[in-house]
Regions:
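A generic structural signal for short, non-catalytic loop/turn and secondary-structure boundary residues
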Residues: 33-35, 48-50, 71-73, 83, ...
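Hydrophobic alpha-helical scaffolding
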Residues: 19-23, 90, 94-98, 148, ...
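ATP-dependent carboxylate/acyl-activation modules
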Residues: 66-141
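Structured core elements
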Residues: 41-42, 56, 79, 89-91, ...
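A conserved regulatory-domain signal marking ACT and ACT-like small-molecule sensing domains
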Residues: 108-220
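Substrate-binding/catalytic subdomain of NAD(P)-dependent oxidoreductase enzymes
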Residues: 1-70, 75-77
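A generic structural motif
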Residues: 45-47, 81-83, 147
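Conserved active-site and cofactor/substrate-binding residues in soluble primary-metabolism enzymes
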Residues: 1, 24-28, 72-75, 95-106, ...
């Protein structure tokens, strides 16, 4: 929300932002992502599409060649893309005892000095509300994992449910059977959130899906 204010000078209400954590992240997904050439990172992303702001926080498969994919430990990073400057990358400590203590101490000193000057670049006036793109209209390529029964026709039914919503499959992987079923993984071409949700809802009503579908956005 703060970066959106700085980048576009608009207010995006926190309560309206789609947020998904890593509670459902499984080691299986980390391994599959690596096999496709990606690493999973929890990203907050925002971009302007046709004058409307698309934003959210999601676990995301990041191409392993991107600098963002290499950020780990107590480090955080910000990637900015501009029309003229291209891609900019800021990287540094964002957690840990010393960086946190430094930030807190800086705030305390500022308060003690009664420093009421605005920071450089801070927009003083009340910010206008962002024109928000409805979350279901956001588009992305997707990583999708399904735990299914080892029955004939399952792959056909899954791909058919996606095809019915206009979602095409770029890659697919099927691994050996386990007690939890057979993991079937798709990487899709770009598709709207609404199409992915409708396809998953259709699959949920079938008898071959043994666990909730896992869907993560893909970057790169």
């Amino acid at each position: 929300v703060l970066l959106i204010r700085l980048a576009w000078g608009v207010d995006y209400p926190y309560t309206k932002m789609p947020i998904e954590g890593i509670r459902n992240l499984d080691k299986m997904d980390i391994d599959f992502a690596r096999e496709f050439g990606y690493r999973i990172k929890l990203l907050g992303r925002a971009r302007m599409r046709d004058g409307k702001l698309e934003a959210g926080v999601f676990p995301t498969l990041v191409n392993h060649t991107y600098l963002l994919a290499r950020v780990g430990g107590a480090y955080n990073a910000v990637r900015v893309e501009g029309n003229a400057v291209g891609s900019l990358f800021l990287h540094g400590l964002g957690a840990g005892s010393l960086p946190t203590a430094s930030a807190v101490l800086g705030d305390l000193i500022s308060i003690a000095r009664q420093n009421n000057k605005l920071n450089s670049g801070f927009v003083k006036q009340v910010l206008p509300q962002a024109d928000i793109l409805p979350p279901e209209e956001a588009c992305s390529t997707y990583y999708m994992r399904f735990m299914v029964k080892d029955d004939p026709g399952v792959l056909r039914d899954l791909s058919g449910a996606l095809s019915d919503q206009g979602v095409s499959i770029a890659q697919a992987i099927q691994k050996g059977q386990s007690e939890a079923g057979v993991p079937l993984v798709f990487m899709t071409h770009e598709a709207p959130v609404s199409a992915i949700r409708k396809a998953v809802e259709t699959m949920r009503k079938s008898d071959f899906l043994l666990a909730p579908a896992i869907c993560y956005r893909v970057m790169g």
